[in-house]
């Protein structure tokens, strides 16, 4: 009996020891890190200046970036990373500063913050340049950038591509970073992807595999769509031939891609015809609402991520540096910097959109047949956005004349709801869907605009303009399906409604753009150790057919809902 107890006790001790060992191994096997982007550091002004007509946020700029507060926001972000004992390193996917091409001192200031962080914590920072960081014939060229940020990836690099900011570095024993400079230094915002850069990524992905490492890619420009109408409204913010590029990256074994540039918090997923899955995590600007970054915990089996925010700064240091902040500003910041940043964003976005509502800004040239129609619509849009939504003489009353019901809400005017929707996109994990009250109000405002302003225009002019718009937006392939579905729901479609459908056809498709089952801010995806490649020809064919069929059915289903809300 004693012998049996002894054996049992030994077994318990052995199993317990193994369990402890496996637990310790699991903890050691985790890789924890933070990802931020678009810091857009500005040297703070000596004194604030009134830039817009807003009661509180009168110093907001057209980009809605908290420029004077930016340095302190970066400080607090680094403080949070330092305080997190599990955080092993920090990735920053470009636009470290705002005016880096012409004001080199901004880079020096940011590098000093990074050096202090690394010296105090021992945690490395890895950077990649963005379109604001360097240029040709500028105060900062790529050699200057690499020299200033030598300690933040380049000195530890396994490979460096001369004349660019691209490099590779091992993050730990299992993972290798491929830091790709996606910029064209001769351009303002568009990408500089080339066959040579793609081939370099291919070589580095193969080398990582040969060395027993999983490749993680970081670049500034988006790999996948993150914004409704991105190919139209933000065509310079995503790499060219993005699906082809995503297919190559996925089939080369890259699963995680970190990008910035678009200033939105969004996660997008794509599956190549071979069945390989790739995720593009676009991280919003750290110094704009919602002052957000992501935190990742990576194991072979699973990649967990969560959004974290900066909700306070040293306001004493702020007022000591820049004069002009009122006590109301400081009180609102101290009550919650995130709420303050949202108000700042809405004020800045309204100012920017008010300046940008021009046909040329929308990519519609003056010689286009539908230019006049669009110009009429845009002119009416500004009026509808500015007028009160409710009350005597308000938009709700005007809409009723066209049998359009504007639901009651707390919004004051059209600008209020439009900027709210924009803020949701910046924050990610958008809380709206096509059934929501807020989307209904927005769509019916657009419907009212077109019905009120275009009702007197001849049908043949509207029909021709509609067909050319379908072609301009690249949605002409679904004209017949859209028209058939609209007729089945609404009956015969008028020329005004047909033009309206053409104008918003990209928006229709955009409502399914984020319907991919991947949460933007908080979630989990399969790790690098999971197998998803399906290389058999039959599987490849099935993947293509299933994907195409799913997209088509999703568009048509949601279009039906959209029409009921939009047309009224």
Predicted regions and their residues:
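Hydrophobic core
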Residues: 9, 13-20
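Beta-strand-turn-beta hairpins that frame and shape the catalytic cleft
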Residues: 26-34, 43-47, 164-179, 210, ...
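N-terminal active-site segment of His-dependent metallophosphoesterases
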Residues: 26-104
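Non-catalytic terminal accessory segments
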Residues: 27, 317-568
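Divalent metal-coordination and catalytic microenvironments
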Residues: 38, 90, 95, 110, ...
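Active-site environment of divalent metal-dependent phosphoester hydrolases
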Residues: 42-45, 98-101, 129-138, 185-188, ...
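His/acidic metal-ligating clusters that form di-metal
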Residues: 81-89, 119, 176-178, 188-279, ...
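Extended active-site neighborhood of metal-dependent phosphoesterases/phosphodiesterases
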Residues: 105-200, 206, 274-277, 290, ...
């Amino acid at each position: 009996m004693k012998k049996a107890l002894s054996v049992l006790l030994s077994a318990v001790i052995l199993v317990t020891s193994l369990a402890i060992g496996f637990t310790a191994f699991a903890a050691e096997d985790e890789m924890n890190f933070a990802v931020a982007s678009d810091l857009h550091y500005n040297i703070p002004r000596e004194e604030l200046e009134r830039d817009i007509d807003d009661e509180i946020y009168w110093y907001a700029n057209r980009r809605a970036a908290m420029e004077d507060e930016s340095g302190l926001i970066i400080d607090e972000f680094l403080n949070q990373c330092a305080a997190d004992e599990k955080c092993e390193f920090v990735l920053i996917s470009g636009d470290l500063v705002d005016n880096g091409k012409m004001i080199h001192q901004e880079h020096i200031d940011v590098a000093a913050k990074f050096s202090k962080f690394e010296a105090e914590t021992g945690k490395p920072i890895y950077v990649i340049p963005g379109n604001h960081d360097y240029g040709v014939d500028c105060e900062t060229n790529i050699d200057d950038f690499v020299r200033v940020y030598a300690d933040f990836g380049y000195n530890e690099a396994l490979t460096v591509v001369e004349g660019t900011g691209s490099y590779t570095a091992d993050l730990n024993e299992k993972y290798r970073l491929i830091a790709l400079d996606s910029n064209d230094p001769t351009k303002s915002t568009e990408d500089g992807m080339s066959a040579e850069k793609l081939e370099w990524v291919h070589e580095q992905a193969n080398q990582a595999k040969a060395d027993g490492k999983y490749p993680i890619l970081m670049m500034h420009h988006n790999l996948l769509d993150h914004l409704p109408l991105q190919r139209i409204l933000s065509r310079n913010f995503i790499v060219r031939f993005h699906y082809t590029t995503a297919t190559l990256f996925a089939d080369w074994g890259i699963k995680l891609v970190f990008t910035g540039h678009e200033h939105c918090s969004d996660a997008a997923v794509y599956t190549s015809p071979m069945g390989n899955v790739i995720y593009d995590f676009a991280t919003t600007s750290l110094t704009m609402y919602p002052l957000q970054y992501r935190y990742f915990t990576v194991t072979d089996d699973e990649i967990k991520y969560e959004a974290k925010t900066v909700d306070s700064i040293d306001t004493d240091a702020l007022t000591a540096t820049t004069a002009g902040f009122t006590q109301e500003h400081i009180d609102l910041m101290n009550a919650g910097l995130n709420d303050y940043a949202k108000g700042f964003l809405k004020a800045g976005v309204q100012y920017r959109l008010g300046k940008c509502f021009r046909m040329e800004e929308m990519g519609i040239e003056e010689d286009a047949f539908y230019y006049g129609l669009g110009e009429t619509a845009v002119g009416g849009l500004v009026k509808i956005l500015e007028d009160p939504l409710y009350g005597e003489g308000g938009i709700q009353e005007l809409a009723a004349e066209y049998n359009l019901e504007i639901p009651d809400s707390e919004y004051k005017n059209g600008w209020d709801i439009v900027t709210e929707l924009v803020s949701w996109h910046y924050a990610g994990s958008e809380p709206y869907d096509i059934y929501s009250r807020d989307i209904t109000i927005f769509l019916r405002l657009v419907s009212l605009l077109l019905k009120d302003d275009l009702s007197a225009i001849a049908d043949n002019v509207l029909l021709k303009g509609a067909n050319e718009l379908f072609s301009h937006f690249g949605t002409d392939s679904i004209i017949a399906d859209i028209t058939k579905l609209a007729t089945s729901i609404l009956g015969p479609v008028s020329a005004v409604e047909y033009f309206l459908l053409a104008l918003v056809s990209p928006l229709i498709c955009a409502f399914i753009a984020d319907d991919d089952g991947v949460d933007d801010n908080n979630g989990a995806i399969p790790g690098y150790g999971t197998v998803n490649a399906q290389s058999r020809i039959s599987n490849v064919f099935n993947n293509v057919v299933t994907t195409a069929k799913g997209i088509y059915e999703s568009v048509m289903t949601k279009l039906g809902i959209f029409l009921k809300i939009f047309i009224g």
